[in-house]
Amino acid sequence: MPRTPADRLLTETVTAGPAWSVVLLLLDVGRSAAALALPALLASAVDAQTTGGDPGTVGRLAGLVAVLILLDIASLLVSPWHVNTLVLGLRRDLLGHVLRLGVRQRAVFSTGDLTTRLLTNTGEVASVVPLAAGWIGSLLMSGGALVALALIDWRLCVAFAAGAPIVTLIIRFFVGRASPLMTDYMTVQGSIAGRLTEVLTGLRSVRAAGAERREIDRVLADLPELHRAGRASWLLQGRLNLHASLVLPLIQVAVVATAGYTLLAGSLTPGQFTAATAYAGMAFGLFNQANAFMALAQARAGARRLAEVLTTGATTPGSRELPAGPGELAFRGVRGPGRYADLTIPGGAMVAVVGESGAGKSTLLMLAGRLLDPDEGEVLLDGVPLREVSERALAGAVSWAFERPAYLPGTIADAIGFGSGERVREAAELARADTFVRRLPAGYDTPCADAPLSGGERQRLGLARALARPARLLLLDDAVSSVDSVTELHISRALAAHPATRLVATHRASLAARADLVVWLDGAGVRAVAPHADLLGQDDYRGLFGAEREPIHV
């Protein structure tokens, strides 16, 4: 029974795609069987030449060599294809689990670290299948070679068995220390990749601050630790190869010397001596795999890193459908992160969420859209707890726009229509994006990668994407912070006419003034829920917006 999540993952990988795993195993077993038959036929051919035996033995020997070549070719074709299929499945499982992680669970792993796990560690884990098949083939070959040695002369088997326990202890000693070193190496590598991703994301800020050297030093701060772990693993592998290369030839010499003695004594024919020499080398095949054992240790280390992510609790979707409703949002006894107990957002209302930076505006929206689950209490949409709503129903009911919207590869139309494919141009017009999109070289068919967009234009496309979906709950997380005042006026008018419940996290007094209600947050949770005009009499509230003037309604 597998003892750890990593061992379970390796076992599941071996048993995934069982048909092709069996084919790969049969190819390795077939190669081992053919290899075992080769010395016997070679012995017959040698004896036939020296004693005038069956001349057809040479032809059978040539046929067996041809079979071995064909089996090798088939294995070289099947193994990479099957491994790549397993890698694809592991990457799909890992990426799917990451996408289901809550915000807090996801924050544990940096983007660069997850990229390393996704691109590198999955390949290392998938390699366990050909490793296992090859090891089983080697085991059968070694066992068959030992039986063949015993059948030729029992003393040959005794000579081999005298040194086998020593080799076993050497391999077990070194491999047991290799896996932790591999894990350390991969962990440090992931940490470096994470910091590199952060720097590349903020590259303009780094250059503007003249901080290139400082950031390079920060990214590579763990390089000595990476060097230490890598050097230790390579030294360990070198020592394993050294010890094996010292012990194995001595045992093989003992077997060959015993065979030579029995040949001189007349107990063996020249052909049997030739076969015994070949079988002695085959019997060591199981032990003479230092690189394979180190690869297995690397696969286990990769499995630990994948299992670390896969065993992190993901958001579990419910199974209920949402009833027809206006999009009323209710917080009941919600605690941690933030305190939003007994807060109700009326269906169809436009509600501004304001507060100082760090007060919990984004957290409130994440709870409302179930990107985050509360530690206590429930968040309900039209009377149904979000924990119980199915993934499909929730995706259809909630639409998002973010401060820094991300676009998938594709065209501008694809970016706006992502998730729905409907109302693309109408949504772009509502978000005041249609005009600048039409100026692009190919309009809505312009690839996102070829569209030089400002921060405000990107935000308008993100808002258009949110408006393109017929959702009952629209969540805008500082989604118009980079647009100019005139554009913001038109957007706020479009939002005011939208039938969905709109929850808008903002730092702008103009948006708060146009909302039906304002939810004012401080570090402890909800401080007040009231119209903007009712809150303006409080100095702390006015201070949230600095010197921004009240909007002129036109």
In which residue ranges do the predicted regions lie?
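Cytosolic ends of transmembrane helices, especially the final helix of ABC transmembrane type-1 domains
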Residues: 211, 283-311
